[in-house]
């Protein structure tokens, strides 16, 4: 938003202009899902600009376009740092547990290389264990070399925000509830024509072993 809104509600978006990123992009789809969940019609109750690539929306907002913008980190915190915008809500919090990142492999590869898949999953689980057992400050210092363009204070702010929002699961088990939520969002946006059975697409065998 362009100003601090401690009492923000999704109804505040009615009649406003919002930079949503490209149609079919995950942020835009999650955003529209939340709007509909709150009784807001994305096509009629507000104006969502889908003409700007998601990587350019922060610059457009900073340049004066729209009343609100949907942003990833570190763009959201960067807008706050330059007093160009304020974070007033989180799509992740209001959407429910959306499985935003997933790893896939062919069934033939899974069957032929279970040890490789298990080692890969175990390594990811170590990362999950680390964020569960360390402070945002400690996490920020470890990941800082991967974000050379962002200063440590900003990284710490971002990690703290993710921490408070319960962004990171304690394990890698892809549960059916989250899978169905993802399909709901895709279906709601018109990007999914036919639902896929959870059992046909997801295996939790490796994640369950890694969690123990």
Question: Where would I find each of the regions flagged by the language model?
Answer:
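Secondary-structure end/capping motifs
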Residues: 111-192
């Amino acid at each position: 938003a362009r100003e601090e809104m401690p009492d923000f509600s999704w109804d505040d978006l009615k009649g406003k202009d919002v930079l949503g990123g490209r149609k079919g992009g995950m942020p835009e789809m999650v955003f529209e899902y939340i709007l509909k969940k709150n009784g807001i019609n994305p096509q009629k109750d507000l104006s969502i600009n889908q003409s700007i690539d998601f990587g350019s929306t922060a610059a457009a907002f900073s340049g004066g376009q729209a009343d609100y913008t949907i942003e990833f980190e570190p763009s959201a915190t960067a807008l706050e740092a330059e007093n160009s915008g304020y974070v007033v809500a989180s799509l992740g919090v209001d959407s429910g547990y959306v499985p935003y990142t997933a790893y896939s492999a062919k069934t033939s590869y899974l069957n032929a290389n279970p040890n490789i898949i298990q080692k890969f999953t175990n390594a990811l689980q170590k990362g999950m264990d680390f964020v569960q057992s360390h402070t945002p400050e400690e996490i920020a210092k470890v990941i800082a070399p991967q974000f050379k363009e962002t200063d440590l204070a900003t990284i710490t702010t971002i990690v703290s925000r993710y921490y408070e929002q319960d962004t990171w699961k304690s394990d890698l088990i892809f549960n059916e509830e989250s899978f169905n939520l993802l399909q709901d969002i895709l279906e709601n946006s018109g990007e999914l024509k036919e639902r896929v059975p959870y059992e046909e697409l997801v295996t939790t065998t490796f994640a369950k072993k890694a969690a123990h």
